[in-house]
């Protein structure tokens, strides 16, 4: 029995040590695993606490980095924090690891209270930090972390001197920097200490035009943190700063601070061996320049929230918005701004119809230069072949040349429409080139025109002696025989107008009585008393009343 008791004691001791080992194993688990079981993935915890930063100046310039850490847990907790902008921000910020502040001697303490029941020490060594420009005045802060839910109690830091010039680099030298994170819970305490000394770095800030009093303050309204199940989490926040005067709470070894733009912005990114902290801040601040050696900066973040990184796969959406005529496509990772393709302006484009001025001038030139000469040539041809009458020359009885004009085609058409018949070969107009209605037929000769003309060779009834229609033929024969005397052919006769047959007393009896042309009893001698001689032997037949002239 005595031997069994030690065995039982050993077994109980071994079981007790086993339970202790299990308990230690449970306590050594990462806080993210415990928080995953304790807190839902979509839950967020909000807390509001002031964050005070005080900076003190020390004139030491070292370029070495010293990081000391101690951990009471066998399994380290690795936290990876990166930043991205939400659709409310105007652009995505890509952070690089460059430091743009020069601190002489600063110490920073952060204390936070936690609701988890575990105790661990997390040590992280800072390797590099950077400040890069960004753009916004005030945005919502959201971040995700693998650390348990905690609330920042206070932050203190001391700045030796800061110099910020227009369009120049801000250089701050840091000798040593201590970051202490303390988290309180019901049954455990998490603390970590980091001692770093950073060499001189530079940052370029946009040009400034205003300056403010040597002290400035800003507020942190609230912060929310929620745990994430993954070791690499996404942490994003932004804060809004407004410069104002406040009481000095830190001593500065430098006599002046620099001025910066009234609207400038920067992004601070800090990376360490065991954790990566990346923050995006969009402040609108103005620093001051003064000879007062004391200055204080009290900053309070506007609001911050932590969203688990596991939900970002579901939140990768594209948001389209139209702001002042511009279409903006944005998601959680990038922001693209496009100019509008169509404007909604009320003004309408004026359209003119018809030919342009150049084409109109070309057409006018072609019409005037080509069409007008063609029209003139056509009119001339119409006049020459259609309007102008044909000219015909005649020789009259006196041997003079008389010009007559044949009727034109328009006259013929007009007469044809009127129903008047005109012989083309026999109808001529007067001596007028245009022609007139004095159209005569040379084939039809009126006897009265022959008797009443001025031709001296033409006999007239008044000049015929002894001619009387009432007298009988015997009386006429006696008068003719008594008054007739042969004078022969007068010298006035022309060869063409000489009588083919003449009559005298000697040869008048040679004609046959049966001659059908002329009979002795019917032939009357024409004698003109007004002239000294007989102009012509002119014989007529009183039966038919026709005058026969020997032409």
Swiss-Prot record:
Localization per Swiss-Prot or TrEMBL: Membrane
Matching Pfam families: Mid2
GO CC terms: plasma membrane; vacuole
Organism: Saccharomyces cerevisiae (strain ATCC 204508 / S288c) (Baker's yeast)
Position of the signal peptide: 1-35
Protein name per its UniProtKB record: Protein MTL1
Effect upon mutating residue 427 to K: In strain: SK1
Main location: membrane
Recorded superkingdom: Eukaryota
Compositional bias ranges of the Low complexity kind: 498-508
Gene: MTL1
Residues annotated with Phosphoserine modification: 481-482
């Amino acid at each position: 029995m005595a031997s069994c008791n030690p065995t039982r004691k050993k077994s109980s001791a071994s079981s007790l040590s086993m339970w202790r080992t299990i308990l230690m194993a449970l306590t050594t688990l990462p806080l993210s695993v415990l928080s995953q079981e304790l807190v839902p993935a979509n839950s967020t915890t909000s807390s509001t606490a002031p964050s005070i930063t005080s900076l003190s100046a020390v004139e030491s310039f070292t370029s070495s980095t010293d990081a000391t850490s101690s951990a009471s847990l066998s399994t380290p907790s690795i936290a990876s924090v990166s930043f991205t902008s939400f659709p409310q921000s105007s652009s995505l910020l890509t952070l690089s690891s460059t430091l743009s502040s020069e601190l002489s001697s600063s110490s920073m303490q952060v204390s936070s209270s936690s609701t988890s029941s575990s105790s661990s020490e997390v040590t992280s060594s800072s390797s590099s930090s950077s400040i890069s420009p960004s753009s916004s005045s005030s945005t919502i802060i959201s971040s995700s972390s693998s650390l348990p839910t905690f609330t920042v109690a206070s932050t203190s830091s001391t700045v030796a001197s800061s110099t910020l010039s227009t369009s120049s680099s801000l250089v701050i030298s840091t000798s040593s920097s201590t970051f202490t994170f303390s988290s309180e819970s019901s049954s455990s305490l998490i603390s970590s200490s980091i001692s770093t000394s950073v060499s001189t770095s530079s940052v370029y800030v946009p040009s400034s035009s205003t300056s403010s009093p040597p002290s400035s303050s800003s507020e942190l309204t609230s912060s929310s943190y929620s745990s994430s199940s993954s070791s690499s989490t996404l942490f994003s926040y932004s804060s809004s700063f407004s410069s104002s005067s406040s009481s000095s709470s830190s001593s500065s070894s430098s006599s002046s601070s620099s001025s910066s733009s009234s609207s400038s912005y920067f992004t601070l990114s800090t990376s360490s061996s065991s954790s990566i902290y990346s923050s995006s801040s969009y402040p609108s601040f103005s620093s001051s320049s003064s000879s007062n050696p004391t200055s204080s900066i009290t900053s309070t973040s506007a609001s911050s929230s932590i969203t688990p990184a596991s939900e970002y796969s579901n939140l990768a959406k594209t948001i389209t918005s139209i702001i002042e005529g511009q279409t903006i496509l944005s998601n959680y990772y990038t922001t693209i701004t496009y100019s509008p393709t169509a404007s909604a302006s009320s003004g309408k484009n004026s359209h003119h119809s018809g030919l342009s001025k150049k084409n109109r001038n070309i057409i006018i030139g072609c019409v005037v230069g080509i069409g007008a000469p063609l029209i003139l040539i056509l009119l001339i041809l119409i006049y020459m072949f259609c309007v102008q009458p044909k000219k015909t020359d005649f020789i009259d009885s006196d041997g003079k040349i008389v010009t007559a004009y044949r009727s034109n085609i328009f006259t013929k058409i007009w007469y044809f429409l009127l129903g008047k018949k005109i012989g083309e070969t026999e109808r001529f107009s007067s001596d007028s080139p245009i022609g007139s209605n004095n159209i005569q037929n040379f084939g039809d000769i009126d006897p009265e025109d022959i008797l009443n003309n001025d031709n001296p060779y033409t006999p007239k009834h008044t000049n015929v002696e002894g001619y009387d229609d009432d007298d009988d033929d015997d009386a006429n024969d006696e008068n003719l025989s008594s008054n007739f005397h042969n004078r022969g052919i007068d010298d006035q006769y022309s060869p063409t107008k000489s009588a083919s047959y003449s009559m005298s007393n000697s040869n008048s009896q040679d004609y046959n009585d049966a001659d059908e042309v002329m009979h002795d009893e019917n032939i009357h001698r024409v004698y003109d008393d007004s002239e000294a001689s007989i102009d012509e032997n002119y014989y007529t037949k009183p039966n038919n009343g026709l005058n026969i002239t020997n032409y």
